Amino acid sequence: MKVGIVSWGAYIPKYRIRTEEVARIWGDDPLRIVDVYLVDEKSVEGIDEDAVTIAVEAARRAIRRAGIDPKKIGAVYAGTESKPYAVKPISSILVDALGLSNNVFAVDMEFACKAGSEGLVAAIGLVKAGQVEYGMTVGTDTSQGEPGEHLEYSASSGGVALIVGRDGVAAELEAVYSYVSDTPDFWRREGSPYPMHGEGFTGEPAYFRHIIGAAKGLMEKYGYKPSDFAYVVFHQPNGRFPVRAASMLNIPMEKIKPGIVVTHIGNTYNASALMGFAKVLDVAKPGDKILLVPFGSGAGSNAFVFTVTDVVQERQKTGVPTVEDMLRDKIYVDYAQYLKMRKMIKLFD
């Protein structure tokens, strides 16, 4: 039974702050910072935006692109690290905001930056089992970085929604694989406004071990070679990590470059790999194979292989904004505006 991505929708807030502007405030060398992280600028949510509004907009675009009745969506999953409420699901808000049926499975997923991709696994399972006609997952974040700390140069905002189904599949799922371990690379305790990270744990023991473990494990299990893929998309905490991961897997740069978005919008956390995936789907051709490998701290990676079908051409002509459209549509803000828009200026009586 053919199961896969029926539609996709993305949303990137139009506001941007340049890396050099953040570096100016903290006295860092902007050229060195850009060279280290390969992030020129990052997206910033508007004063009236949060992870929920971003998720709603991305999901509306996915539904519009699919051209389906939203009431046919029988499951909705939301993955985020930046919930507006400590106790109140985003998924239930999506049900009413999108006009879904009340007879729907709705869950907020938890696994750092790969919670949205865990929703994809769950949606695929329900559709494949015949329990729902369509399932949706949304990866959305307004990610946090402590002022003056290096995460501030990349932590950004954005969202991606994927609709899974059996009919009208634009990218058919061929294989999925997972690699997980208890690795304390990144965390945020209850009540803490900003996350902490384990410095040396974030690279080799966390990102590379799990990205490579998932991608290599999938290829070995199912017999894929790097040459089989037209596009490869990894989680993008910065501009260097995905390029290095590709090199470690002998994947040429031309296969990974089309899905790189971090240079222009920073690390959108749960939307990071999914944003690159959406960007690739915007231009992919029938027959193309796509390797998608999200990563979540704590730590784990899922690896997916999709084959693009003829339906993708119809989906690409719906007039829904592409990721490239949103990368070009931007308004720059200074650091003071950035603090205001991110509600980081606290007033006390």
UniProtKB/Swiss-Prot annotation:
Assembly notes: Interacts with acetoacetyl-CoA thiolase that catalyzes the precedent step in the pathway and with a DUF35 protein. The acetoacetyl-CoA thiolase/HMG-CoA synthase complex channels the intermediate via a fused CoA-binding site, which allows for efficient coupling of the endergonic thiolase reaction with the exergonic HMGCS reaction.
Class of the enzyme per the UniProt entry, highest EC level: transferase
Origin: domain of life: Archaea
Function: Catalyzes the condensation of acetyl-CoA with acetoacetyl-CoA to form 3-hydroxy-3-methylglutaryl-CoA (HMG-CoA). Functions in the mevalonate (MVA) pathway leading to isopentenyl diphosphate (IPP), a key precursor for the biosynthesis of isoprenoid compounds that are building blocks of archaeal membrane lipids.
Entry protein name: Hydroxymethylglutaryl-CoA synthase
Active-site residue list: E81, C113, H235
InterPro entries cross-referenced by the UniProt entry: ACP_syn_III_C, HMG_CoA_Synthase, Thiolase-like, Thiolase_N
Alphabetical list of PANTHER family matching this protein: 3-HYDROXY-3-METHYLGLUTARYL COENZYME A SYNTHASE, HYDROXYMETHYLGLUTARYL-COA SYNTHASE
Classification of source organism: Archaea, Thermoproteota, Thermoprotei, Thermoproteales, Thermoproteaceae
A Gene Ontology biological process term: isopentenyl diphosphate biosynthetic process, mevalonate pathway
Residue numbers binding CoA: R240
Keyword line: Acyltransferase, Isoprene biosynthesis, Transferase
NCBIfam families the record matches: HMG_CoA_syn_Arc, PRK04262.1
